[in-house]
A protein has these predicted regions:
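Bacterial carbohydrate/catabolite-sensing allosteric modules
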Residues: 5-201
Length: 201
């Protein structure tokens, strides 16, 4: 991917930000703000966050998570913050198991994405815990599978259709008018899907 980014070929990135490249990104800051605010409205204060590997997207999401918690005067223990890879079921399962073993475990776990969340959900069920009666969880992305399982995942749905359309339009513009196409980063808002995996405390 880096070779492509550093080449002279026309490139538009989706949910990745690189210097001197057009990018189409989901509004990660607002997405996490909306999601964490919803969880706090449900009276959760012990919220853990398993985030993805370091990237511009991850930094935006983590900063927003910390900011919302700070605004509500909620202290986040270092042990509640874990790192895994996006879409990595196995590593997310390990991180979830570590959180459950804490002396004061969280009442809600925020996963890096809906797909990786399945690793955590499997560990929670294997521990004999029920979602959301015993522990709440939330994902990110809003993949179609997340809306089909029971209980339905609480998540942020990214507007991938709009993002794809904008990326295609900008790529065509780069090909047809390379010297006049402005290098911009376009932010596309997502939407909160309340689902049923976050219970009131």
């Amino acid at each position: 991917m880096i070779e492509l980014i550093e080449s002279n070929l026309p490139v538009v990135t989706i949910d990745r930000i690189f210097p001197n490249r057009i990018s189409i990104v989901s509004d990660n800051e607002k997405g996490i703000t909306d999601l964490v605010s919803y969880i706090i409205e449900k009276k959760h204060t012990k919220i853990a966050y398993i985030h993805g590997r370091d990237s511009a997207v991850t930094r935006q999401r983590l900063a927003s998570f910390r900011e919302v918690m700070k605004q509500h005067d909620i202290v986040v223990p270092n042990a509640y913050i874990r790192e895994t890879d996006y879409r990595d079921i196995q590593r997310t399962a390990i991180a979830t198991a570590e959180l459950l073993k804490l002396p004061d475990p969280p009442t809600c776990i925020l996963f890096p994405d809906d797909y990786a969340a399945y690793g955590g959900i499997n560990v929670i069920k294997a521990a004999g815990l029920r979602i959301p009666e015993d522990i709440s969880v939330a994902g990110y992305d809003g993949i179609s599978l997340a809306t089909k399982i029971e209980p339905k995942m609480t998540t942020i749905k990214q507007d991938t259709k709009t993002m794809g359309m904008l990326a295609a339009e900008k790529l065509i513009a780069l090909i047809e008018k390379p010297s006049t196409t402005e290098i911009v980063s376009i932010t596309v808002p997502g939407i909160l899907l309340p689902g049923a995996t976050v219970a009131s405390q």
